[in-house]
Amino acid sequence: MRQQFLYVNGQDIGALTLGLLSEAPLLETFTVGPEKFLESLDGFLTKHDLSVDTLDGALVITGPGSATALRGSLAIMNTLAFTSGLALFGHEKPKEQSDLVFIQSLDLSKLPAEQGELEPVYAHEPRITRTNRDALRRLKPNP
């Protein structure tokens, strides 16, 4: 029986790419934000008559990319792995490389399952700024 692997790429804040990995990979990109990633994954699995229990594993892109998007996609996949025992294969992918080219360059038989949770690789350091508002959310006067 042929193995079924899910492909999940949540590098981009405005899109989620999902796929089934086989001789001819099937890829679909959903133009949604992280708040719709789980809904998109559910719809994708339903459309292709799959469930997490029927999958042999998932190849998950860990970055680099948007911090918010990666936290969303990895939280979903880490939760599925924890609750269902789904094997996760974490891999970095250059953001400019197409998903199809990336998938075709891999040998799935040589990817070891990650131990524990997958962790994101961010595109840059966090950009934390000070607020210009007080505790009541009023603009502070300029000094």
Where are these regions (language model features)?
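Oxyanion-binding and handling regions
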Residues: 1-39, 47-52, 83-143
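Residues at secondary-structure transition points
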Residues: 32-35, 67, 71
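Short HxH-centered metal-ligating active-site micro-motif
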Residues: 44-47, 51-64
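DPxDG-like acidic metal-binding loop motif
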Residues: 57-62, 68-86
